[in-house]
A protein has these predicted regions:
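Alpha-helical cap/lid subdomain in secreted, periplasmic
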Residues: 56-203, 207-226, 234-239
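Active-site catalytic microenvironments for nucleophilic, acid-base chemistry
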Residues: 32, 212-216, 247
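Serine-esterase "nucleophile elbow" of acetyl-processing enzymes
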Residues: 1-44, 59-67
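Glycine/Thr-rich phosphate-binding loops of Rossmann-like dinucleotide-binding domains
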Residues: 14, 49-50, 81, 124
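Gly/Ser/Thr-rich beta-alpha loop segments that engage phosphate groups in nucleotides
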Residues: 10, 48, 78
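Structural motif
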Residues: 48-56
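Conserved small/polar residues in nucleotide/adenosyl-binding loops
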Residues: 243-250
Length: 252
């Protein structure tokens, strides 16, 4: 059994019933993987590379990950919070240094690290045009780290910007926690959240990461199912609404 350990933030985390319809990318990623692949989702709301390490979450991965496993490293949203010293990292120094710590944890166990640039926010200007990206320095820093350390990179940031531009302000709302009052019991007053995802968004952006793995080839592409199998699995996901962790244990 191959395992994907995922270190990230709220855009990836597995959500509980009381926050439905919020859905993390890691929560649905097994839709794209073969049956012998398990996602162990350590992603947690509000975490940066710094706080993830400081809280011992990387240490827990260090204790569990093994040869032939994968470590997906996806940060940026919270590293940029300059007013919060518990989370902030400077993109071209401490952020890059922390990424290398994650990479080294994977490699010392014979596991495969993968860097994933942060998901773009729904940052439309005047309700028409997608604004300047919020994470550009962290994306550049992650790309530099990938090149320096010879680690494959799935550029979710660029791919998600492309999808947001194509869908437009109105069309992209269905992917995010952006909806009117009365649509969901957990949010009777509605929500205008341009960062966190609903099911359709999580599936879409998980698919973009899968595309990046396919392009990387080799052991990374070998994680993924064929297109025909994907369609069958997606029908099952929609039918069952699997808002529970696919991980073998609770990673809270």
């Amino acid at each position: 059994m191959r395992k994907i350990f995922w270190a990230s933030d709220s855009t990836v985390q597995t959500n509980k019933f009381m926050t439905y319809p919020q859905t993390g990318i890691g929560q649905v990623f097994s839709l794209y993987t073969k049956d012998d692949v398990t996602v162990v989702n350590y992603a947690k709301n509000g975490r940066s590379t710094k706080s993830f390490i400081d809280e011992g979450r990387l240490q827990r991965i260090d204790e569990e990950i093994g040869a032939g496993d994968f470590l997906f490293i996806q940060f940026g949203h919270n590293d940029e919070k300059s007013q919060d010293p518990a989370r902030y990292t400077e993109p071209f120094s401490t952020f890059m240094e922390n990424l290398e710590i994650f990479i080294n944890v994977a490699r010392k166990h014979g596991a495969y690290p993968v860097l994933i640039t942060p998901l773009e926010r729904r940052c439309f200007v005047d309700d028409k045009h997608l604004g300047i990206g919020a994470h550009s320095d962290y994306v550049a820093a992650m790309k530099q780290t990938a090149e320096k350390c010879n680690v494959p990179l799935a550029d979710l940031y660029s791919m998600s910007r492309t999808e947001l531009k194509k869908a437009g302000e109105m069309g992209s709302r269905k992917w995010f926690m952006y909806f009117s009052k009365g649509e969901y019991k957990n949010y009777p007053d509605g929500k205008t959240d341009n960062t966190h995802l609903r099911y359709d968004g999580a599936v879409l952006f998980a698919g973009l990461i899968a595309k990046g793995l396919q392009e990387a080839g080799g052991v990374y592409a070998d994680l993924l199912v064929e297109e025909e199998t994907l369609n069958e699995k997606e029908i099952g996901y929609r039918t069952c609404l699997l808002y529970t962790s696919p991980s073998p244990r609770d990673t809270e």
